[in-house]
Amino acid sequence: LATQVFCRVHVDDIVAGVIAGLDGPPGAYNLADDYPCSQNRVIEAACDLAGAAWPPLQSLEAANLSPMALAFYAENRRVVNGKAKRLLGWKPAYPTYVEGLRAVSAITSPAIASAPPAPASNVQR
């Protein structure tokens, strides 16, 4: 699947694009990141962020995918977002999958405390 690429988009960027579109010229707009890449690369980057090993690669035949999934992976899904940028002034806050994965990782990773917790107080507010 290394040759099959597609674009992604962070939910925050979708919301920003929809809001920009409310005041923009009528029309259809593509909201996508600026860096289409393979699913393998995204999985590898996610594993790297999580400190996990990359999963073994599997052929499409061995994956036992549905006909719909096979059709999806048979094509490239590059999306151009230039119209939204030009006419709506939209700019993705997460221009590549890397920034998106880092944002998700930041909200799902446990915080590391640098000091012990403060003692509980008996005072009610």
Can you name each region flagged by the protein language model?
Residues 6-9, 37, 79, 95:
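Residue-level signal for the nucleotide or nucleotide-sugar donor/cofactor binding architecture
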Residues 1-21:
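Substrate-positioning beta->alpha
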Residues 95-125:
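Amphipathic terminal alpha-helices
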Residues 14-69:
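Mid/C-terminal beta-alpha module of Rossmann-like enzyme folds, strongest
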Residues 15, 43, 85, 98-101:
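Generic structural signal for individual residues within well-ordered alpha-helical segments
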Residues 20, 48, 90, 103-107:
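Residues within well-ordered alpha-helical secondary structure of globular protein domains
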Residues 12, 40, 82, 95-98:
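Residues in well-ordered alpha-helical elements
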Residues 11, 44, 63-91:
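Conserved C-terminal active-site "lid" loop/helix of NAD(P)H-dependent oxidoreductases
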